[in-house]
Amino acid sequence: MNAAKVETSSMGMLQRADLTAADCLQEGEMGKKIQGKCFRIISTVSPVKLYCCYGVIMVLTVAVIALSVALSVRNKIPAMEDREPCYTACPSGWIGFGSKCFYFSEDMGNWTFSQSSCVASNSHLALFHSLEELNFLKRYKGTSDHWIGLHRASTQHPWIWTDNTEYSNLVLTRGGGECGFLSDNGISSGRSYTHRKWICSKFVSSCKSRVGSVPRHV
């Protein structure tokens, strides 16, 4: 009797073991199927989406770079135009420099006569507002002294230009006279009745480009 019970118990354990093994095999096969599906999803869908994302990012990056370059070039164009040389359109016999025209006389006269001659040609005895202009006048005048537009009431008064603006003392004026003239040493002063050549200057409101006639420059 006991032997029969033992045999029956052993058979039950073997059946349960078989069921457990079958279940494990079934679960294993299902796991493989699920794993295969996951691999297929990862291998077919995710890379495509990832590549699409990469593509969109690259397109946007290129677009941003192109826009930045275009804006940079556009901002530089006005600056380049500002640096384009401006050629002053001066009357015959006058010399253009910057935004002014200058006339260097061959005749001689006192300071008052020289100023009157300049006024007759819609100008004044020469004014300068920078060292570049002053160096140009010194270079072009030759060896002769020339009256310019500086004058003062006395040595106790400031220097005034012929347009009634005060001289900034950009360059020291030598001498104790009441009228200024340009010499090889720079700006000097002397008596108004002394006869010298003179320089007239006037502003111009327009410039000529490179195309067409170009006035004489030094």
Swiss-Prot record:
Q: Any S-S bridges, and between which cysteines?
A: C90-C101, C118-C200
Glycan attachment positions? N110
Provide the C-type lectin domain boundaries: 97-201
Q: Extract the CDD domains matched here.
A: CLECT_NK_receptors_like
Ligase as UniProt keyword: no
Q: Where in the cell is it found?
A: Cell membrane
Cited PROSITE patterns: C_TYPE_LECTIN_2 (PS50041)
Q: Name the GO cellular-component terms.
A: plasma membrane
Protein topology in the membrane = Single-pass type II membrane protein
Query: Can you cite a GO biological process for this protein?
Result: cellular defense response
Kindly give the Gene3D superfamilies that the UniProt entry links to this protein.
Mannose-Binding Protein A, subunit A
- Record bears the keyword tRNA-binding: no
Known role: Lectin-type cell surface receptor.
What name appears for this protein in its UniProt entry?
C-type lectin domain family 2 member H
**This protein's encoding gene:** Clec2h
